[in-house]
């Protein structure tokens, strides 16, 4: 049979019903196979027709499967053949006849379905018995098609196009599926004003990602549903266009345009009752464009200009500029409505409004302190995204995490059960032994197991009871939510009896039960309230900043910063005090919060602790000495090397890779940045530092603004080092600083120096300082050896020897490190490799005349 004039979906149904016969080992291809294939087709057209008539597709499928199972199975060997039955061919021919009589150029799947109602075999009888006849089906097809003819091979794609390629936002509002919208009244009012115009009544919402553009549409849908809009919009529906569904599966040229035209045709026929919402409006420009074909935006322009299409677009400012503004004809048909980022206070209001939705979804409770923390902490610490999206994400993730914890065993109970399993394994092993010690151990373990089993049973009982109470509370919340939706519907329908019953009877009763359930003590086994600490924990995981930095009293922590830094850096009290004061000023909030936490220029000779202080500062502030970006400025001696910091300009190799400085800070906004040997860099490089030091921001080569507000900038230099090396202990510090600053001012411009928080001098180390450093360095070596279970001991004479030999005023502490390597570490390494020192040994180091002696104690 020739099926050239069948649509692609119809051909697929015919192929599938043939495969079904082969799969079931049936010799004939019957109308029953055709009916089974139609009931399983993917477009949903047949299901829509059956629902329209009042049939039940699931019941039909069951009856068809029952009849298919009755057909005899025949094992067809290589010489056998499966053939179409006369009845099956008759049905297909009838479908062709019906299509021709209806004025269709192609036979569609609904025409095949209609032809089955004329069938006298079991397939036709099943349809008749379920109330599906040719008359009812013809009326349902007419209603589905809305007068359209099947004149293309993809005709089915144009049926009910809005339902297929769109989402009814107003219907979602009606069913209570949308979150409440808080604080966007001005933007919604502006959109309503534009929609109420006679011509070019098409607003486009422009704003950064995550500020709530789509939420404004949902708010408008809720207002339309509540009839809180002008009369011109009261009967409107908002349909969100799914551009992905429009494009998907459009194999042939012109098919995409056909689908879009069918959508626009339905909108036009609605006489202004449908408002089309296109999220990511810029996707329309160029979509569907092939050689000589028009893109989607050109199909919209005529209807937009005539006012036949009510359309709301949403896009970001960058994409609007890049795509929409370039097409002036499209841009002038839309009226921009700018959507700004809400303030922290507005975000808190938004979060309070949607709180119940998240509590209901995750079956947890959200404290108000968690809401405030989500808004304030996300604004302070997550700088590359926008409110309220980033705050909502924090609440959502914290709730999700708690939900997972609630569904698993409490930690205490889990540890108890693991201990029980461990004891059972030990008992099984000990029962194989017959000695007295094993018998005593079995007795003690049996007694312990008995106690633990009893404790585990009690805790399990309490845990299950607590879980049951939480599940009961969750069920009551769902009932309360549904009751409120029913109340809204009853009030709108003026069903006063039902509204009164819900408002004064059912809802108060559920609320009383819910309050009683929430007040029940769960014995501390389950934590169900999301708190400020949970939000802070999520922030900590996202950004890498330690949680205690945000929640512990920073006043107490920062008051002891000198003490903590002095444990690592010796002999630089003035430098430690200067950097501590600057950090305290920043953290106490009495300086500009838009600047870095601190910016310092460390001046001093080599080996006096400039870099070590920077590492110690990173360890104190971020609990990680490696939270440090070290940039060796001797690598930036040429003017063009500045591009390595912020990224290569457009058109150059490496443009898409970003810069060393900007990319590191984007990925980890909380770190100490060390510009080492800064005087060796080209002077033009300091021009980019001006905006970092002053505004706490820097724009990279791709136009992305990188936030430096949570970094500490440290620059080190050897300028004036010879003055500091030759400084006498009783010499006036201010005089020395003036002499050093003359060198500094000769190299750096005043506007650069003026933006630094502190210029700190590092003085040369004296013998007492070296002695303290010896103890620190040997302490580090002691920790390393302890990992191998080797104990290192040293007496006063060894410390004095190392301090004397390692002291060099010109080179600071670095010669000491080399001395310890040469005198101690090299000898220890040889002894360990030779087997003289092994795990469990104690190694004593003492001075013997003019050298160190290593003594090994077993």
Swiss-Prot record:
Domain free text: The Clp repeat (R) domain probably functions as a substrate-discriminating domain, recruiting aggregated proteins to the ClpB hexamer and/or stabilizing bound proteins. The NBD2 domain is responsible for oligomerization, whereas the NBD1 domain stabilizes the hexamer probably in an ATP-dependent manner. The movement of the coiled-coil domain is essential for ClpB ability to rescue proteins from an aggregated state, probably by pulling apart large aggregated proteins, which are bound between the coiled-coils motifs of adjacent ClpB subunits in the functional hexamer.
Annotated spans, Repeat 2: 84-147
Region feature C-terminal, mapped onto this chain: 765-858
Taxonomic classification: Bacteria, Pseudomonadati, Pseudomonadota, Alphaproteobacteria, Rickettsiales
Keyword field: ATP-binding, Chaperone, Coiled coil, Cytoplasm, Nucleotide-binding, Repeat, Stress response
Name of the featured protein: Chaperone protein ClpB
Location of region: Repeat 1: 6-71
Binding site for ATP 1: 207-214
Lineage top rank: taxon: Bacteria
Stretches for region NBD1: 160-341
GO cellular component terms given for this protein: cytoplasm
GO terms of biological process kind: cellular response to heat; protein refolding
Function (record text): Part of a stress-induced multi-chaperone system, it is involved in the recovery of the cell from heat-induced damage, in cooperation with DnaK, DnaJ and GrpE. Acts before DnaK, in the processing of protein aggregates. Protein binding stimulates the ATPase activity; ATP hydrolysis unfolds the denatured protein aggregates, which probably helps expose new hydrophobic binding sites on the surface of ClpB-bound aggregates, contributing to the solubilization and refolding of denatured protein aggregates by DnaK.
Region (Linker): 342-544
Entry's family note: Belongs to the ClpA/ClpB family.
InterPro entries: AAA+_ATPase, ATPase_AAA_core, Chaperonin_ClpB, Clp_ATPase_C, Clp_N_dom_sf, Clp_R_dom, ClpA/B, ClpA/B_CS1
Segments of this protein annotated with the region NBD2: 554-764
């Amino acid at each position: 049979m020739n099926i050239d004039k069948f649509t692609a979906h119809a051909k697929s149904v015919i192929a599938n019903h043939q495969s079904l016969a082969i799969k079931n080992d049936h010799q004939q291809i019957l109308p029953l196979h055709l009916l089974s294939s139609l009931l399983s087709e993917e477009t949903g057209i047949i299901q829509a027709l059956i629902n329209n008539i009042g049939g039940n597709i699931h019941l039909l499928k069951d009856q068809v499967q029952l009849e298919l199972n009755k057909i005899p199975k025949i094992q067809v060997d290589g010489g056998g053949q499966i053939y179409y039955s006369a009845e099956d061919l008759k049905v297909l021919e009838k479908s062709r006849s019906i299509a021709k009589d209806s004025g269709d150029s192609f036979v569609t799947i609904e025409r095949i379905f209609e032809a089955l109602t004329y069938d006298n075999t079991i397939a036709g009888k099943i349809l008749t018995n379920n109330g599906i006849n040719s008359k009812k089906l013809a009326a349902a097809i007419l209603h589905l098609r809305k007068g359209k003819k099947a004149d293309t091979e993809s005709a089915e794609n144009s049926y009910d196009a809005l339902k297929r390629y769109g989402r009814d936002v107003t219907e979602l509002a009606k069913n209570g599926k949308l979150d409440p919208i808080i604080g966007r009244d001005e933007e919604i009012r502006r959109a309503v004003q534009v929609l109420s115009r006679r011509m070019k009544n098409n607003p486009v919402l422009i704003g950064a990602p995550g500020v709530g553009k789509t939420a404004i549409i949902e708010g408008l849908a809720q207002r339309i549903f509540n009839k809180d809009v002008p009369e011109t919009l009261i009967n409107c529906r908002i349909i969100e266009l799914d551009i992905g569904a429009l494009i998907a599966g459009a194999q042939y040229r012109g098919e995409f345009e056909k689908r879009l035209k069918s959508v626009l045709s339905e909108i036009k026929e609605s006489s202004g009752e449908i408002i089309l919402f296109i999220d990511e409006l810029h996707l329309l420009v160029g979509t569907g464009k092939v050689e000589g074909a028009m893109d989607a935006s050109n199909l919209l322009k005529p209807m937009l200009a005539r006012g036949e299409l009510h359309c709301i677009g949403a896009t970001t400012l960058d994409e609007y500029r890049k795509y929409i503004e370039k097409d002036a004809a499209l841009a002038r048909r839309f009226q921009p409505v700018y959507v700004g980022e809400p303030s922290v206070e507005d975000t808190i209001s938004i979060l309070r409004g949607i709180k119940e939705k998240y509590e209901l979804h995750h079956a947890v409770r959200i404290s108000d302190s968690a809401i405030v923390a989500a808004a304030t902490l996300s604004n302070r610490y997550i700088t590359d995204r926008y409110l309220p999206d980033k705050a909502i994400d924090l609440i959502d993730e914290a709730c999700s995490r708690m939900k997972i914890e609630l569904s698993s065993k409490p930690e205490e109970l889990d540890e108890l059960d693991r201990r029980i399993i461990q004891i059972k394994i030990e008992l099984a092993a000990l029962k194989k032994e017959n000695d007295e010690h094993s018998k005593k151990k079995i007795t003690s373990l049996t007694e312990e197991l008995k106690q633990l089993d009893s404790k585990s049973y009690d805790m399990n009982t309490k845990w299950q009871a607590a879980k049951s109470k939480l599940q009961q509370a969750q069920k009551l919340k769902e009932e309360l939510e549904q009751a409120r939706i029913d109340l809204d519907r009853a009030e709108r329908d003026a069903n006063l009896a039902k509204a009164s019953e819900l408002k004064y009877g059912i809802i108060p009763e559920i609320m009383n039960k819910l309050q009683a359930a929430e007040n029940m003590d769960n014995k501390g086994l389950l934590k169900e309230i999301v708190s400020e600490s949970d939000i802070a924990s999520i922030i900590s995981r996202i950004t890498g900043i330690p949680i205690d930095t945000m929640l512990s009293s920073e006043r107490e922590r920062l008051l002891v910063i000198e003490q903590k830094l002095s444990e690592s850096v010796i002999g630089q009290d003035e430098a430690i005090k200067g950097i501590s004061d600057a950090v305290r000023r920043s953290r106490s909030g009495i300086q500009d919060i838009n600047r870095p936490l601190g910016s310092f220029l460390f001046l001093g000779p080599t080996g006096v602790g400039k870099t070590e202080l920077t590492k110690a500062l990173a360890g104190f502030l971020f609990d990680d000495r490696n939270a440090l970006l070290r940039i060796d400025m001797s690598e930036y001696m040429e003017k063009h090397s500045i591009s390595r910091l912020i990224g290569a300009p457009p058109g150059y190799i490496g443009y898409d890779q970003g810069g060393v400085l900007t990319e590191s800070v984007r990925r980890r906004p909380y770190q100490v940045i060390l510009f080492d040997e800064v005087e060796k860099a080209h002077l033009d490089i300091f021009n980019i530092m001006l905006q970092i030091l002053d505004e706490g921001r820097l724009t990279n080569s791709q136009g992305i603004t990188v936030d430096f507000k949570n970094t500490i900038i440290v620059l080190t230099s050897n300028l004036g080092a010879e003055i500091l090396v030759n400084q006498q202990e009783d010499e006036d510090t201010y005089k020395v600083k003036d002499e050093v600053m003359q060198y500094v001012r000769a190299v750096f411009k005043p506007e650069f120096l003026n933006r630094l928080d502190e210029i700190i001098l590092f003085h040369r180390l004296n013998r007492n300082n070296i002695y303290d450093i010896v103890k620190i360095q040997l302490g580090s070596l002691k920790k390393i050896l302890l990992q191998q279970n080797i104990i290192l001991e040293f007496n006063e004479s060894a410390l004095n020897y190392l301090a004397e030999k390692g002291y060099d005023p010109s080179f600071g502490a670095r010669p000491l490190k080399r001395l310890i390597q040469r005198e101690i570490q090299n000898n220890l390494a040889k002894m360990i490799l030779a087997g003289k020192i092994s795990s469990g040994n104690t190694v004593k180091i003492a001075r013997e005349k003019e050298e160190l002696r290593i003594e090994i104690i077993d």
